[in-house]
A protein has these predicted regions:
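Short strand-edge motifs at loop-to-beta-strand transitions and within beta-strands
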Residues: 22-26, 66-70, 236, 391
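Short, structured interface segments
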Residues: 175-178, 233-257
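Short, surface-exposed beta-strand/strand-loop-strand elements in extracellular ectodomains
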Residues: 43-56
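Short, small/polar residue-rich loop motifs at catalytic or cofactor-binding pockets
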Residues: 41-44, 230-233, 386-388
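N-terminal beta-strand motif that seeds the catalytic metal site of vicinal oxygen chelate
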Residues: 102-123, 132-136, 197-203, 249-280, ...
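Vicinal oxygen chelate
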Residues: 108-117, 159-180, 185-215, 234-239, ...
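Beta-strand-rich recognition domains
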Residues: 1-45, 75-77, 81-102
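Core segments of cupin and vicinal oxygen chelate
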Residues: 115-171, 210, 217, 227-230, ...
Length: 409
C-alpha cells in the first residue's frame, strides 16, 4: 500500500491590487475524509476562503505573514471560493492536500510513446541509433476501442512499431506511431527542453564521444557537443527528424571505442512539471517510492547544451518503482529559469513528439476502479478486448499516463 499527500487543489497564487476586490471560485475532486488547506500569505490582510460553503479562512486569520494550515473535511466533489477585499496589495498561495493510500499494482514501465510524421524514416533513425530489436507492425492499423481510449471520437488510421535496444525485443520499448489521414495532427514537438510535459528520454552509452562523432557523421541533429553538468554527468541532446529530443549520457562503465553506437539502456523518461511537490506525491501514490535528488543550475556550456543562451535552473527528483519491479525511473523537473508555463499536449494522443507513458499493472480492472474512486480524470473508455486492455489517466499537469494489463470480472 502506497501513501501520498496528494494536492487536491492548487497550488494557486491569488494576487490583489489595493482597491481592486477579487473573487475566484473553482471545483476540485477528492475523497471523503480529512484534508488541509495550506495558505502562504504575502501582505493580504482582508481575505475570506470558503470550502463547500463553509468559511475556513477569515481576515483575523491573516494577521501574520507566512504559512497558515487549516483543517478541512472533503467529499468527492468540492468547491472553493477565495475573496479578497482589496484593502491591501499582496498575494496568497492556496493549496489543499489530502493524505491518501492506494495500491495500483504497477509492475514496470512498458514504453514511452512517440509520434512521428514518417514511419519509414523513423524506423531508419532508430536503426542508426543502434536499436537492434523491432516489432513491426506492432498492432492493427485501425481499432475503434483503442482509438477511443486515446481520445478519438471514433476510429483512427495508424502505423505502429516497437523499438528495443535488444533483439529479440524486450521492454521498455519506444512505442512509435504514425497517425495517418484524418487522425494526423500537424503540430511540431515541444520546441524547448523546459516545456511542461514529456520532452525527452535518456539513454546511457559506454562511448558518448564516439557515438556523438558517429551519429553526427550520419547527419543526426545535435543541440551541442557533449557537455558536463555541475553534478559531473556528461551528456548530449539530439533530435530526430521531427524535432523530438533524446538525451545520451556517459555510462559509469566505459568501453573501448566502437564503429557504431554503444547505447546500453533507457535510464529515465523526463517529465517537466509545474509543481514538484504535487507531481512527486501523485507518482508516489502510483508506486514510485524510491527517489534521488536532481536539482541543477548553471550557465555557459551547461545551458547551451540544453539549447539556452542564458543561465538555467531547475528543481528535480528522480523517482523509481520499488522492490519487486524493474526499477523504471521518471525524471521530474520543475524549471525555474527560463520558465515556460505553456500546458502539455491536449487530447487526443496524436501530437508529434513524446506524448504518453505506459505502465503495466497486475489487474487493470482493479487499478481503474481505484483511480476512479480517488477522483482522477480518465481520458476515454477502456481500449482492447475482454482479457487485456489499456486506459489513460491525466497526471496533475495533464501528462497522459497509460495503464495496461489483464482485465478481471
Amino acid at each position: 500500500m502506497n501513501q501520498a499527500n496528494l494536492t487536491r487543489f492548487g497550488p494557486r497564487v491569488f494576487e490583489c491590487a489595493q482597491g481592486a476586490p477579487t473573487t475566484f471560485s473553482a471545483t476540485f475532486r477528492a475523497i471523503d475524509g480529512t484534508a488541509k488547506l495550506v495558505l502562504q500569505n504575502s501582505g493580504i490582510d482582508d481575505a475570506r476562503i470558503e470550502v463547500n460553503g463553509h468559511a475556513v479562512v477569515a481576515p483575523q486569520d491573516l494577521r501574520t505573514t507566512g504559512e497558515i494550515v487549516v483543517p478541512l473535511t472533503l467529499q468527492p466533489e468540492n468547491t472553493i471560493e477565495v475573496r479578497m477585499a482589496g484593502a491591501s496589495a499582496g498575494a496568497i498561495s492556496v493549496r489543499v492536500t489530502q493524505l491518501t493510500q492506494a495500491d495500483l499494482g504497477l509492475l514496470r514501465q512498458g514504453y514511452f510513446g512517440l509520434n512521428t510524421s514518417d514511419m519509414a524514416r523513423q524506423r531508419a533513425f532508430y536503426d542508426t541509433l543502434g536499436f537492434k530489436g523491432e516489432i513491426y507492425p506492432a498492432g492493427p492499423e485501425t481499432s475503434t476501442t483503442f482509438a477511443r481510449a486515446l481520445g478519438f471520437p471514433d476510429d483512427y488510421l495508424i502505423h505502429v512499431s516497437l523499438h528495443s535496444l535488444e533483439d529479440p525485443p524486450v521492454m521498455p520499448f519506444v512505442d512509435t506511431v504514425q497517425f495517418r489521414g484524418d487522425s494526423y495532427r500537424d503540430e511540431p514537438p515541444y520546441p524547448d527542453l523546459n516545456h511542461i510535459g514529456m520532452t525527452y528520454a535518456t539513454y546511457s552509452t559506454t562511448d558518448l564521444d564516439g557515438d556523438f562523432a558517429y551519429l553526427q557523421a550520419k547527419g543526426v541533429d545535435f543541440v551541442s557537443a557533449p557537455a558536463t553538468a555541475p553534478n559531473g554527468e556528461r551528456f548530449v541532446f539530439l533530435k530526430d527528424q521531427d524535432g523530438t529530443y533524446l538525451k545520451l549520457i556517459q555510462a559509469v562503465e566505459v568501453a573501448a571505442a566502437t564503429s557504431s553506437p554503444s547505447l546500453v539502456r533507457l535510464v529515465n523518461t523526463n517529465m517537466n512539471v509545474t509543481d514538484l511537490e504535487r507531481s512527486r506525491e501523485f507518482y508516489r501514490l502510483l508506486g514510485f517510492t524510491e527517489s534521488a535528488p536532481g536539482s541543477l543550475a548553471g550557465a555557459g556550456e551547461f545551458a547551451a547544451a540544453h539549447g539556452f543562451d542564458g543561465p538555467i535552473e531547475f528543481e528535480g527528483v528522480d523517482i523509481s518503482l520499488g522492490e519487486g519491479t524493474d526499477g523504471a525511473t521518471l525524471q521530474l523537473r520543475q524549471w525555474k529559469r527560463p520558465h515556460d508555463d505553456a500546458p502539455p499536449y491536449s487530447p487526443p494522443v496524436n501530437h508529434l513528439g513524446i506524448d504518453r507513458i505506459n505502465f503495466y499493472v497486475k489487474d487493470l480492472t482493479a487499478a481503474i476502479r481505484t483511480m476512479n474512486e480517488l477522483g482522477f480524470e480518465q481520458l476515454g473508455p477502456i481500449g482492447g478486448g475482454p482479457g487485456f486492455g489499456l486506459v489513460f489517466f491525466f497526471d496533475p499537469d495533464g501528462i497522459k499516463v497509460q495503464l495496461a494489463g489483464p482485465r478481471t470480472a
